[in-house]
Structure formats: C-alpha cells, structure tokens
Amino acid sequence: MAVASRVDAALTAVPRERFLPPGQRRHRRRDAPLPIGHGQTNSQPTTVRQMLELLDVQPGDRVLDVGSGSGWTTVLLAWLTGAQGSVVGVERVPDLVAFGSANVRAAGMPWAHVREALPGRFGAPSQAPFERILVSAQAPELPLDLVSQLAPGGVLVVPVAGRMLRVTASTDDTGGPAVEEHGWYRFVPLVADPPDEPQVD
C-alpha cells in the first residue's frame, strides 16, 4: 500500500474526536489545531497527514513521538507500526501525560505508551535508537539530541523555525544527516523543563 493510502487508512481507523476534551469534540471535523489545555493543541489534521507521510513509518518500526499531547499521533503511529513495532510518546505536562496515557490505553494498542519527559532532555535516550521520530512542536534549531536517537538510516520529522524538516540519519559513521525542507508550518514551541536541581544537605 502506498504511503498516503496507509496514512489515510490510519486517520480513518483512529478518529480524532476520541482524543479531544469533551468541549472540543463538536469541532472534530475542523481542519485546525484544537486546544487540549495547558497551552497545547491537538494538531491540524492536514498537517498530521503531511507529517506522517514524510515520516513513512513501516510495520515493525520503533517510533518516538515527541510532544504526544492527547495521544492521537501516538495511536496513529501505533496503527502504522502494527503490533510488531513499538511507540513511545513523550509529554512534559503531567496532566497531558495522564490524558494521553488514558487515550492510548483506550485504543487497545499495548505496544504504544506515553511517559513523562525527562527534565532537561528531549526524547527518550534510554530507549533509543528509533527508526522514526515525530516531533509535534517547533524547535528554534535542529535538535541534535533527537538526531542522535535515530537508528542508522532513521528518519526524524520536525518543524524548525517555521520550516518542516525531514532528517535522515546516515547509514554509517562517515557522514552527517541529510536534511530536506518541506514547507512552512506553525506549532507550539518545543520545550524541555530545566534539569532537576541537585539536592544539598
């Protein structure tokens, strides 16, 4: 099946409304970001479709979903990987970790889960490498911490300074990643909470 067809099938199988707060569900068909609390949003469906097409998730892939929010993209990614793959959603807002986790559990895909982001770190370095990384928040520059979590030949899709980038890791240690630009987009900012302060007796 072509990439676009697989993504459309995922979007049909995983309805957006199940990942929206009750007050936003009447807007489920609106092609716009919708608020989910704490200044965060459930992304615009056409943007999600385009990002998933660029990511080109394959069955069995290990996938990282940065800024997982409501859990919608986490479950879409899990549909694309199938049960032979795995998806880790990372979210920094505790209330959204709980909201997204509940939504992922309700979807019945145990190979996907949401965890709270580590202070001062992007992604899930202890669970790397990943074949695919999706970032649903805008970085001011290419987040090398996330590039380093890619498997050889892995793909990162991330908005950077308004541009959507598709970053492909080198298949060996002889070169840096290949970076392609794919249009202009607007997202909430990518943020890492400060590292925990060391305890002083």
What is the predicted role of each segment?
Residues P159-D201:
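Active-site capping/gating segments
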Residues M1-V66, W72-L80, D95-A106, G175, ...:
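Class I SAM-dependent transferase core
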Residues H38-Q40, A83, D196-Q199:
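Short, charged/polar low-complexity linear motifs in solvent-exposed/disordered segments
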Residues D56-S170, A178:
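Conserved nucleotide-cofactor-binding alpha/beta core module
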